[in-house]
UniProtKB/Swiss-Prot annotation:
It catalyses: 3-dehydroquinate = 3-dehydroshikimate + H2O. NCBIfam families: aroD (TIGR01093). InterPro entries: Aldolase_TIM (IPR013785), DHquinase_I (IPR001381), Type-I_3-dehydroquinase (IPR050146). CDD domains: DHQase_I (cd00502). This is 3-dehydroquinate dehydratase. The active site is at residues 121, 146. 3-dehydroquinate binds at residues 33-35, 65, 188, 207, 211. Pfam families: DHquinase_I. Involved in the third step of the chorismate pathway, which leads to the biosynthesis of aromatic amino acids. Catalyzes the cis-dehydration of 3-dehydroquinate (DHQ) and introduces the first double bond of the aromatic ring to yield 3-dehydroshikimate. Pathway: Metabolic intermediate biosynthesis; chorismate biosynthesis; chorismate from D-erythrose 4-phosphate and phosphoenolpyruvate: step 3/7.
Length: 229
């Protein structure tokens, strides 16, 4: 049995695309992530009941990744919060909230801490203050804390692995971390060492640079983790 949960994003750009999605393609995933930021707010609202009905047997993470954090949608604070509040009516298992980009929205959603994946994405670097950011996020008491950063050299990846391990040992097993790009691929399959409890894998199109396919991720983690469970 694997320790690391595999999350597979679904990125739809039009309402009609949901009909073409086969639930069976995602059976190897532990969690399905609806990356809704490729749709307009109105289309998100229209698709939501159909999406949650279609994947009612799956655990669902809802993510609205904004342009500021590497996503595809640019919305006001008010609209960001409105979308998340509307989605919460469908009782997703988890909902991503961008902590440093949308702090006011998180403050309004604190009653949903047990569902929140508090996230921070940096597509430029591994910031020198990453540890302090992780501690600040951890102190908010959410279900998970997620960081994705861009390494410039090999030591950046090793630093992230060590920071994740240190945070897990100190504060518990609710951290999710990854170094993006080809250089960071090791971070996506090393959760059994670092304590990072989720990894993200692509079905076909990846949602982040360096993402490994679902099939390959399952094979690698089964090889690395099955004897450790």
């Amino acid at each position: 049995m694997r320790r690391t949960k595999i999350v597979v994003p679904i990125m739809l750009t039009e309402l009609t695309e949901l009909e073409k999605v086969s639930v069976s393609d995602y059976l190897s995933a532990d969690i399905v992530e609806w990356r809704a930021d490729f749709l307009s707010a109105d289309d998100i609202f229209e698709m939501a009941p159909k999406f949650f009905e279609k994947f009612k047997e799956s655990k669902i993470l809802f993510t609205l990744r904004t342009v500021r954090e590497g996503g595809n949608i640019q919305v006001s604070e008010k609209k960001y919060l409105q979308i998340l509040q509307e989605i919460l009516k469908f009782e997703p298992d988890y909902i991503d909230v961008e902590y440093f980009s949308h702090g006011p929205s998180f403050a309004a959603l604190k009653n949903y801490r047990e569902k929140i994946v508090l996230s921070y994405h940096n597509f430029d670097e591994v910031p020198t203050d990453l540890t302090s950011r992780l501690i600040k996020m951890h102190e908010e008491g959410t279900a998970f804390v997620k960081v994705a950063v861009m390494p410039e050299r090999e030591c950046d990846v090793l630093d992230l692995l060590q920071i994740t391990r240190d945070m897990t040992l100190e504060y518990g097993n609710h951290f999710i971390s990854m170094a993006m790009g080809d250089l960071g691929r090791l971070s996506r399959i090393s959760g059994y060492l670092t304590g990072s409890c989720w990894t993200f894998a692509g079905l076909e199109n990846s949602s982040a640079p360096g993402q490994i396919s679902l099939k390959e991720t399952v094979e690698i983690l089964d090889l690395l983790e099955n004897e450790l469970a």
